[in-house]
Amino acid sequence: MAACWVHYLLLLLLGVSHQTLAQSLQCAVSKVLRLEDDPSRTFNWTSKPDKVETCNPGELCQETVLLIKAEGTKTAVVASKGCASREIEAVTFIQYTPPPGVIAISYSNYCNSSLCNNSKNVSLFWKPPDTTATSKILGALSCPTCVALGSCSSAPSMPCANSTTQCYQGKIELSGGGMDSVLHIKGCTTAIGCRLMAAITSVGPMTVKETCSYHSLLQPRKAEESRASGRSTSLWVLELLLPAVLVALTHFP
């Protein structure tokens, strides 16, 4: 009987110890919503040392950033760090809409060691788009252009690169991951219809809702041009488990 009691006590202590360890994961915490001239040089993603939270069981550390830019505008930066529900560690990079015109990309990292969500900048995956080549090949299309944290009803009209297909005018609503924000975007785009975010409805822990006005469908190019440019539109997603990502990053140019 005594041996059974000792065995039960050991199992109980091990269970408490395991639960304590599971709850001891600490993550950096921050949320950022701003416009940057060149995020690869000016955006500091470092969290304050005292901004730390302890995760619940079943949560990992996460860091997520969404970047949206139109030609001639500043770049909208929406960034979140903290604990989030996730089963496995993973790094994901998505280019929703390629240049020329409005560009949208995101990066998210889920990791399972304390304060592992410690990226300091976005220079590894964000490079300022080179507009020198496309600016010399302008088509007949011009679009109101802006990226704003609020309304941009008086956006200036900008000429579009020849490979763009329409004027985009929409808003991106973001919630979760400490965010509750709306981005207003206008500009030339290679996307077809209301698909700046390629119909993807989440970015890391953030839920995404994209809505467009009627003006997004104005001034489409000829069907032949639309089909030709559509072939060059790309959406690519890279999702790797953490060990593979660490190997890849050590060889990053």
Swiss-Prot record:
Subcellular location: Cell membrane; Membrane raft; Cytoplasmic vesicle, Secretory vesicle, Acrosome; Secreted
Membrane topology term: Lipid-anchor; GPI-anchor
Glycan attachment points: 44, 112, 117, 121, 162
Name of the gene this protein is made from: TEX101
Protein name (Swiss-Prot/TrEMBL): Testis-expressed protein 101
Thylakoid as UniProt keyword: no
Occurrences of domain UPAR/Ly6 (ranges): 53-117, 143-218
Listed SUPFAM superfamilies: Snake toxin-like
Biological role stated in the UniProt entry: Plays a role in fertilization by controlling binding of sperm to zona pellucida and migration of spermatozoa into the oviduct. May play a role in signal transduction and promote protein tyrosine phosphorylation.
Subunit architecture: Interacts with VAMP3. Interacts with LY6K. Interacts with DPEP3; co-localized on the cell surface of spermatocytes, spermatids, and testicular spermatozoa, co-localized only in cytoplasmic droplets of caput and corpus epididymal sperm. Interacts with ADAM5.
Keyword Cell division part of the UniProt annotation: no
